[in-house]
Structure formats: C-alpha cells, structure tokens
Amino acid sequence: MVMTDPIADFLTRIRNGNMRKFDVVEAPASKIKRQIAEILKAEGYVKDVEYVEDNKQGVIRVFLKYGKNGEKVITNLKRISKPGLRVYVKSDDVPKVLNGLGTAIISTSTGVVTDKVARQTNVGGEVIAYIW
C-alpha cells in the first residue's frame, strides 16, 4: 500500500511513542525526515537520532526524551501542511508557536529550518509542523 503522507506517519509514530512512553521509535528514512529529526534533536525535544542503513531506504531511530519524573518533553506534535492542503507563509508571516514557547518546522529554499531561523534569515516556505 502506498503511503500518502510519510511525514505525517513519522510525526504520528513519534507522538504515539511519546504517549506510550517508549524509549525508541523507528521509521523508514528519507531526507526530509532526517532533517526534521535533527531539528527535534537540536531544539531539545528528543535525546538522540540514529540512522541505520539497510539494503533498502534505511531506518531512522528517534530516542525520546522525558523529564526527571517521567513527564513528557513533547506535549504535542501537529502536522500543518498536508498533501490535500498545503500551507505556505511569506517571510513576514512566519508563525510563532505558543508565543515562542513552541517550534514551527518550515521547509524553505535553504532547507528545513525552525521558525526562529526562518525569521532571522528572512525566508518563508511550507509550514510542515508545530511542536510544543
């Protein structure tokens, strides 16, 4: 069966693993998923990201992060731009998630970046997801 939205599947695997308090979540690898996973790691939402090569497309392992008392670091993860309804923003209209407490992941001409980086470099693009 063909997957219509692999990014949504990747984010859903992370969201479900987070709700069930899994240590590791695995998903089929792609370039954009790797970039999203690296942003999650850089922003402190996950512990680590590992790429495992098999003879096909590879696998991304995301090591989820929890607080001292087991509280979730990721409160919510929401897909914004979908295959049926793409959401694009200009450089002036880059959104702030929860007034700056969350992070928007944006696919720009310079690559996949956070909302903060998009604002600093004055670029717009497709809003992939919100995370807080």
From Swiss-Prot:
Pfam families: Ribosomal_S8 (PF00410). This is Small ribosomal subunit protein uS8. Signal peptide: none annotated. The gene is rpsH. One of the primary rRNA binding proteins, it binds directly to 16S rRNA central domain where it helps coordinate assembly of the platform of the 30S subunit. GO terms for cellular component: ribonucleoprotein complex; ribosome. GO terms for biological process: translation. GO terms for molecular function: rRNA binding; structural constituent of ribosome. The keyword Membrane does not apply. SUPFAM superfamilies: Ribosomal protein S8.
